[in-house]
Every structure is written in structure tokens, then in C-alpha cells.
């Protein structure tokens, strides 16, 4: 439901109140491929679709796999499980880099997202809390999840001063995409 059980935003709040979990931006790397595959599924791909892991080029950019090898023909499920860079690049190109960026925004990414081809490999900087929100939404069957840290505040007499009110979750993608 979005409850944050623990968060470490820094090592010493007195020295620096900057919360790296909610404020800092970092490149998410392969975790970003979630949005590439969600966009592909929404565009009609299915996990058993066959794709080819092979050298590809988009303009001057030639993505490589981390192991330096290519697997040839594989299914999408395997490409996602093994985080195959060339397949993610091909999917992003086919569905559109703007479509991938839109999917990321639908799942809670609030930072600006580039639409350059390399974005499919996580080169756009994002906040950790946004990535957490997105992955939680997938775990919730595609329903939005808003992170929160305080559930209730009472006074010494037990009177409720604040009670977290869960917002109505909305569907961020079709049921078959995240479900």
C-alpha cells in the first residue's frame, strides 16, 4: 500500500539533512529496462515472442551486452531475465523511446527523461523513491502506489491527530501488463 518500513537517506542528519533516497538523482542502469518491457507488452508483445540478441546500431550508438556475447534467438522473458542490452535497445526503438519515457512517467518517475536511444539502458537520472514507487506498482498489479512513512499520530491521551489516508489507487497500465 506504499508504507515505507525503512529509509536511509544519509549517514548523519545533523551534518546533512539531504535525503539521498528522496532528493538525489542517479542513473538506474538496467533497473530502467522495466519500463522498456512494460511499453513493449502494452504495444502487443508477449513474453514468449522471439527476438534476436545480435549487434545493433542506432545512429552512432552501438549497445553491447555486459558479457560481450550475443545469444542469438531468444524469447522476451529470457532477454528480460538476463538483462540483454541489445534486445532492450531494439524494443525501445520499435515501440518508440518517447513511449518508454511515457511509461516511466505513468509509473511515477518525476524527473525529466531523455528520449535518446541509450535511455533504454537507464542513462536518465531518477530518484530512488520514484523507482521504488514504480516497482511497487508492478507488485500491486499495475495499481499506483504512493510511498508514505507516517501512518498515525496520537497525543498522550490517545486522540488521533493524524491518520494516513490512502489515496484511491489508479491503474497505470492494462491488467495484463503488470498483472
Kindly label every feature range from the protein language model.
Residues 2, 25-51, 79, 134-138:
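Active-site SXXK
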Residues 4-7, 12-18, 32, 78, ...:
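A penicillin-recognizing enzyme superfamily signal
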Residues 5-7, 50-52, 78, 90, ...:
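Structural recognition of the beta-strand scaffold that forms the well-ordered cores
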Residues 12-14, 18-30, 66-67:
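Short, contiguous acidic/charged loop-to-helix segments that flank catalytic cores in large enzymes
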Residues 13-15, 41-49, 110-112, 140-145:
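Secondary-structure transition/capping motifs at alpha-helix termini
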Residues 39, 43, 82, 90-94, ...:
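Generic, well-ordered alpha-helical scaffold segments in large soluble proteins
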Residues 45-100, 144, 156-179:
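Conserved catalytic neighborhood of penicillin-recognizing serine enzymes
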Residues 62-65, 96-133:
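Mid-domain, small-residue-enriched loop/turn segments at the edges of structured enzyme/sensor domains
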Amino acid at each position: 500500500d506504499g508504507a515505507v518500513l525503512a529509509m536511509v537517506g544519509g549517514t548523519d542528519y545533523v551534518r546533512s539533512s539531504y535525503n539521498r533516497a528522496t532528493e538525489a538523482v542517479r542513473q538506474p542502469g538496467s533497473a530502467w529496462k522495466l519500463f522498456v518491457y512494460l511499453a513493449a507488452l502494452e504495444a502487443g508483445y508477449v513474453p514468449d515472442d522471439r527476438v534476436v540478441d545480435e549487434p545493433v546500431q542506432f545512429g552512432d550508438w552501438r549497445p553491447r551486452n555486459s558479457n560481450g556475447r550475443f545469444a542469438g534467438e531468444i524469447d522476451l522473458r529470457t532477454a528480460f531475465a538476463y538483462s540483454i542490452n541489445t534486445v532492450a535497445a531494439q524494443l525501445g526503438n520499435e515501440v518508440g523511446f518517447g513511449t518508454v519515457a511515457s511509461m516511466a512517467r505513468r509509473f511515477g518517475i518525476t524527473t525529466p527523461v531523455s528520449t535518446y536511444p541509450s535511455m533504454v539502458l537507464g542513462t536518465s537520472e531518477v530518484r530512488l523513491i520514484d523507482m521504488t514507487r514504480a516497482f511497487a506498482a508492478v507488485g500491486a498489479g499495475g495499481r499506483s502506489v504512493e510511498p508514505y512513512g507516517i501512518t498515525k499520530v496520537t497525543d498522550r491521551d490517545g486522540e488521533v491527530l493524524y491518520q494516513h489516508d490512502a489515496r484511491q489507487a489508479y491503474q497505470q497500465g492494462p491488467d495484463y501488463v503488470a498483472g
